[in-house]
Swiss-Prot record:
Protein's name in the database: Large cysteine-rich periplasmic protein OmcB, serovar E
Gene coding for it: omcB
Lineage: Bacteria, Pseudomonadati, Chlamydiota, Chlamydiia, Chlamydiales
Purpose of the protein: In elementary bodies (EBs, the infectious stage, which is able to survive outside the host cell) provides the structural integrity of the outer envelope through disulfide cross-links with the small cysteine-rich protein and the major outer membrane protein. It has been described in publications as the Sarkosyl-insoluble COMC (Chlamydia outer membrane complex), and serves as the functional equivalent of peptidoglycan.
Residues making up the signal peptide according to the UniProt record: 1-22
Species the sequence originates in: Chlamydia trachomatis
Subunit structure as annotated in this protein's UniProt entry: Part of a disulfide cross-linked outer membrane complex (COMC) composed of the major outer membrane porin (MOMP), the small cysteine-rich protein (OmcA) and the large cysteine-rich periplasmic protein (OmcB).
Length: 547
């Protein structure tokens, strides 16, 4: 027990002296003398065999060696690093300095060494907190020669070894081994110091907002039908996007219910991963391609755009009908009906319906269903750019102006589509004016009277105009008087009636002339009829026997 006490005291004292020596407080001769005294004192104290006095002596000795605010840990034995050389140096013992500073440093040296044989000095630095710029300095023994170190370094001019450690984390260890060779007998004092800067770390979380915009919309739409677009905005970044704004100009050819040409949506701040959806609705006003562009912007970020192109289709069907502007009644007239699809969509279930006016009779319509005065054609599909043609042959029974109405109805992806057309024909009648002349008394005695009656009839289908009548008699007959729808004049043996402005179809008028027989013979009376429809006047002769 005494031996152990003596060893502990000796190690403590020697270490303290070494520290003073390394710091420059003691000269070499003073250090050797002090070490000898310490060893002698240790022998004396060991004989007292009192632990209390041993602790008191240790405390006083610490004060004498000027080791302030440091607690020297109990000495313990350790194995030497490197090859086992018990014959060259003794067992390693460690001196440990415990404090509340940044780095804990321990130094292990052998109890004894042999002159001329290298021995190790082991320095271990342990971070008590995160430190940077750690500098460990080792003072070489005065009567020893530097052999090598790990990590490698070179002694300075004043016999110091310096190692620099950029960073030593909390709990991290850094070990240094120095090999020295004693040159003469005596005590080899060595000391190590450490200097470090504590490292304080703080964390600021940095992120980057990333606003993305996508847009959904139809590839095709119908004219004057609502077109809806969905604008999807999402923050795919790692930070809040501030003041997010979406601008959507109204595309050319579109109209918005607000009347504005640029729509602006303020979304405010968007958290990472947050998603917003905006719905816009437009009304297309013309056919063609329209591109809707949405642009999103936010504070400090780049603008992003998304666009959708929509083809605006117009379902369209056109129909036309062509026929004679006029014709005579009972004469056939052909109408040509043309149906076309100038639009962008396929027309389905196309129905072409031709309605004729009353008084017109359908004579022929190929491929159609005929019902009274209605003609109907049906087609399953009519592709864009395709056209069809139909013919119908009709005849009017009576004069007049009659209209032929055609309506086309169809279905498409954009709904129903209708078109109509008409053609008007003026049907003319033909006037057929006839005349009949008879005498009421035949034969007639001289001095008696007879009456010539003239009936004018329009047997045609149209009126006749400016109907004129003139009668000429032979010398045996003398006109006495006359009557009729118009006035007349008697000039000698001739009677002329004023023109009748109009003689309607199937209308009959009668003229009469009273004649006196003035001489015997075979008398003659000639009636001459003219009108606008009679290119050559018509004459009729009646004879009367006078005795």
């Amino acid at each position: 027990m005494n031996k152990l006490i003596r060893r502990a005291v000796t190690i403590f004292a020697v270490t303290s002296v070494a520290s003073l020596f390394a710091s420059g407080v003691l000269e070499t001769s003073m250090a050797e003398s002090l070490s000898t005294n310490v060893i002698s004192l240790a022998d004396t104290k060991a004989k007292d065999n009192t632990s209390h006095k041993s602790k008191k002596a240790r405390k006083n000795h610490s004060k004498e060696t000027l080791v302030d605010r440091k607690e020297v840990a109990p000495v313990h034995e350790s194995k030497a690093t490197g090859p086992k050389q018990d014959s060259c140096f003794g067992r390693m013992y460690t001196v440990k300095v415990n404090d509340d500073r940044n780095v804990e440093i321990t130094q292990a040296v052998p109890e004894y060494a042999t002159v001329g044989s290298p021995y190790p000095i082991e320095i271990t630095a342990t971070g008590k907190r995160d430190c940077v710029d750690v500098i460990i300095t080792q003072q070489l023994p005065c009567e020893a020669e530097f052999v090598r170190s790990d990590p490698a370094t070179t002694p300075t001019a004043d016999g110091k070894l310096v190692w620099k450690i950029d960073r030593l984390g909390q709990g991290e260890k850094s070990k240094i081994t120095v090999w020295v060779k004693p040159l003469k007998e005596g005590c080899c004092f060595t000391a190590a110091t450490v200097c470090a800067c504590p490292e304080i770390r703080s964390v600021t979380k940095c992120g980057q907002p990333a606003i993305c915009v996508k847009q959904e919309g139809p590839e095709n739409a119908c004219l004057r039908c609502p077109v809806v677009y969905k604008i999807n905005v999402v923050n795919q970044g790692t930070a809040i996007a501030r003041n997010v704004v979406v601008e959507n100009p109204v595309p050319d050819g579109y109209a918005h219910s607000s009347g504005q040409r640029v729509l602006t949506f303020t979304l405010g701040d968007m958290q990472p991963g947050e998603h917003r959806t905006i719905t816009v609705e437009f009304c297309p006003l013309k056919r063609g391609r329209a591109t809707n562009i949405a642009t999103v912007s936010y504070c400090g970020g780049h603008k992003n755009t998304a666009s959708v192109t929509t083809v605006i289709n117009e379902p369209c069907v056109q129909v036309s009908i062509a026929g004679a502007d006029w014709s005579y009644v009972c004469k056939p007239v052909e109408y040509v009906i043309s149906v076309s699809n100038p639009g962008d969509l396929v027309l389905r279930d196309v129905v072409v319906e031709d309605t004729l006016s009353p008084g017109v009779t359908v004579l022929e319509a190929a491929g159609a269903q005929i019902s009274c005065n209605k003609v109907v054609w049906t087609v399953k599909e009519l592709n864009p750019g395709e056209s069809l043609q139909y013919k119908v042959l009709v005849r009017a029974q009576t004069p007049g102006q009659f209209t032929n109405n055609v309506v086309v109805k169809s279905c498409s992806d954009c709904g129903t589509c209708t078109s109509c057309a008409e053609a008007t024909t003026y049907w003319k009648g033909v006037a057929a004016t006839h005349m009949c002349v008879v005498d009421t008394c035949d034969p007639v005695c001289v001095g008696e009277n007879t009456v010539y009656r003239i009936c004018v009839t329009n047997r045609g289908s149209a009126e006749d105009t400016n109907v004129s009548l003139m009668l000429k008699f032979s010398k045996e007959l003398q006109p006495v008087s006359f009557s009729g729808p118009t006035k007349g004049t008697i000039t000698g043996n001739t009677v002329v009636f004023d023109s009748l402005p109009r003689l309607g179809s199937k209308e009959t008028v009668e003229f009469s002339v009273t004649l006196k027989a003035v001489s015997a013979g075979d008398a003659r009376g000639e009636a001459i009829l003219s009108s606008d429809t009679l290119t050559v006047p018509v004459s009729d002769t009646e004879n009367t026997h006078i005795y």
